[in-house]
């Protein structure tokens, strides 16, 4: 066997926090990249204390350390796209913005994480939120806020599809190139897609499952993987939405709270073993074989 003909997959970078339960953050991103035949690398913005029951506390990575992680990665590998999640503070948001300005990546997806679904920990401080809104927003290919995140960014109430459309257009006016306002919190999961003056709604099947921990991370990472694989943005969003729906449907009940998605639902069929075979006993112990006469 040799690997001389193996094709190097797109290398995708996630810049986000670490979740010890591995349902969200960089763990969810890396699983999603792998499930889309991409190779993931990560720069960690924070260590969190959390489980499926919620976020207890957040410990931000020093900005100098975050910069060092980013520099080490870009010095070593060719990055095809960047996904940005939790940033924790203005210093880290500024470090990431400088990084994007320096290297001009083709595909950048921002999942603007401000507060956890469960728990009261702050995932981005007020100064950081303002910086994301004023500076980072205009530098990314697409931003994927859920309803509470859209409210944080726009300052308006976002409770239904009509308000989602207004919020999406407002984010475009604020400098975003493209927006997907995700409506997983609604009775009928509907996403609103905005590019320029174009506004579309994408409906989906409602999956009755409490296991949605990391769904936003998975969705944004799936969009990036599709973009890096050659899809146009609209198609990437549709494919990512279908993927997340199935990953929730096939999710795991792990822990006492909201369990994680199953990013690897496509790989559940047992694969034949290649390159592994039983070695006959006589081949293992030649000294024990009877001498020939």
Can you say where each PLM-predicted feature lies in the sequence?
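Conserved N-terminal subdomain of the carbohydrate kinase-like
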Residues: 2-14, 26, 30-122, 267-270, ...
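Acidic-glycine-rich active-site phosphate/pyrophosphate-binding loop
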Residues: 3-8, 25, 187-202
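Charged C-terminal helix
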Residues: 9, 57-60, 234-293
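Short pre-catalytic strand/loop immediately N-terminal to key active-site residues, enriched for Gly-Thr
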Residues: 15-21, 199-213
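Glycine- and other small-residue-rich loops at beta-strand/loop junctions that grip anionic moieties
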Residues: 18, 84-85, 182, 212
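Phosphate-handling active-site elements
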Residues: 37-41, 199-200, 226-240
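Conserved phosphate/ATP/ADP-binding segment of small-molecule kinases
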Residues: 124-199
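Short, small-residue alpha-helix embedded
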Residues: 151-152, 209-233
């Amino acid at each position: 066997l040799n690997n001389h003909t193996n094709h190097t997959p797109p290398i995708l970078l996630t810049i986000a926090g670490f979740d010890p339960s591995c349902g969200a953050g960089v763990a969810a991103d890396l699983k999603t990249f792998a499930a889309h035949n991409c190779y993931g690398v990560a720069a960690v913005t924070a260590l969190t204390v959390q489980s499926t029951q919620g976020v207890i506390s957040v410990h931000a990575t020093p900005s100098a350390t975050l910069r060092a992680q980013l520099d080490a990665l870009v010095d070593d590998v060719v990055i095809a796209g960047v996904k940005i999640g939790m940033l924790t503070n203005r210093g880290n948001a500024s470090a990431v913005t400088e990084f994007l300005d320096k290297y001009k990546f083709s595909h950048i997806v921002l999942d603007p994480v401000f507060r956890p679904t469960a728990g009261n920990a702050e995932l981005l401080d007020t100064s950081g939120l303002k910086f994301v809104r004023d500076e980072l927003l205009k530098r990314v290919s697409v931003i994927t806020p859920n309803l509470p995140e859209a409210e944080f960014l726009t300052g308006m109430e976002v409770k239904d599809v009509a308000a989602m459309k207004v919020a999406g257009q407002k984010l475009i006016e604020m400098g975003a190139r493209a927006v997907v306002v995700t409506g997983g919190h609604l009775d009928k999961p509907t996403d609103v897609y905005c590019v320029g003056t174009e506004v579309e709604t994408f409906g989906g099947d409602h999956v009755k499952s409490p296991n949605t921990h990391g769904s936003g991370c998975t969705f944004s990472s799936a969009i990036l993987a599709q973009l890096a694989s050659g899809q146009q943005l609209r198609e990437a969003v549709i494919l990512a939405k279908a993927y997340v729906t199935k990953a929730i449907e096939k999710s795991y009940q792990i822990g006492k709270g909201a369990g994680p998605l199953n990013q690897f639902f496509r790989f559940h069929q047992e694969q034949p073993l290649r390159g592994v075979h039983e070695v006959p006993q006589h081949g293992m112990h030649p000294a024990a074989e009877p001498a020939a006469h």
